[in-house]
Amino acid sequence: MNSQPPMLSLPASYCRDHVSPIPSVAVWAETTTGTMIETLFLDQSLAFVEKVDWHGSLVQRDHILPIWRNRYTAISGIDSSGKVDATTGATETHSFALDPYLVAGEAKKFVVCVEINAPSDPDDKWQSAELGQPSLLYTALVKVDTDQRYRTLDLTAYGSPGKGELRYDLETVSSAKRLVDLLLVKLEDGRQEDSSSSE
């Protein structure tokens, strides 16, 4: 038997009536204390620049996906202006890798986070024509050694634009909560049968 680490995937389903235009998304893993481990997916348009043309408006990405951007600053030491943030502390020992957490038999666990934000979706509370309602954070605790292969990501908070602070008064958000139909984390057994062992 050829032992391989477990593999992580994230099936997602959107509510079709509420996904035009397509929202911006970031997916990352973090420790149970809130330190980012690794960015697993980031909307390509937001990957390399701080100011982006977000469906016709020039917007800072820390206003689009503020929670992800704040977590990234904390481990990279680079703030949203591109400058080194001396208050974030040293990051030289950060591995930026999820692999060490995907080890069976060691009671490993981590949190998968998905931040999603749709442009131009203002409501009575959030009236900015550019930003509209804030980004929403969905999370799931993943325990590597559990027999449960799927975890549902639950709506947890929304992001404070520019600051990345978590806000929990989700009753102030309206249609943005209907963007996502289902988000799952799937942890697959990475072990594969060694064909030579059956000969």
Go through each PLM region and give its residues.
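Structured domain cores in non-transmembrane regions
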Residues: 32-122
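Short amphipathic, basic-aromatic surface patches that mediate peripheral association
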Residues: 5-22, 45-47, 122
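Intrinsic-disorder/low-complexity, polar/charged segments enriched in Ser/Thr/Lys/Arg/Asp/Glu/Gln
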Residues: 5-9, 93, 111, 137-139
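Short beta-strand/loop motifs in extracellular/secreted proteins, especially
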Residues: 23-25, 110
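Glycine-rich, aromatic-bearing surface loops/beta-hairpins
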Residues: 100-199
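Short, solvent-exposed aromatic-acidic interface loops
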Residues: 15-16, 39-49, 155-166
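Beta-strand signatures of extracellular beta-sandwich domains
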Residues: 26-30
